[in-house]
Amino acid sequence: MPTVVHDAMKRAKNDIEYILFLRKGGEYRTTPTLQKALSMLSRDEMKTWFRSIWSDLRGASTREGHPAPYPPEVAERLIKMFSFAGDTVLDPFAGTGSTSQAAIITGRNSIANEIEPAYVNIAQHRITKAARHHRFVGAIEAEVIFNGDVRSTPIPVDNRVPAAV
């Protein structure tokens, strides 16, 4: 009997991730009507996405070789929930570019920063592919910046990937 319990525990996995939403202080900005219209969420999206716990998403694949993968739908939801079409999404820890890819798909601009060269190459490929396949109004450009450790390299290398090819 203890063997069965032991085997079951080998497969136990904690798939809970906490998401913190932080906002710059001050007044809310005025958003143009067209930008708001392009960013509308459906009633079902509002109902599902603004819950405290999301139980409708599946885990991400580790096939990309990154140690901390997450489902692309997580980034897409958060971007659509907390930004408007045409806004810029900053991802300081870009990894393989999931957030920038989601930004392009949802019509946002993206600036991504990653220190690992192997991940930068994967991110550039994914962003370029997303830019070719998604013609959403609002997306202007995406950048993947490889600048090593930003504490010692204050000037980033310009490595832009055009989103509207």
Identify the residue ranges that each predicted region occupies.
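Core catalytic lobe of class I
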Residues: M1-I122, V165
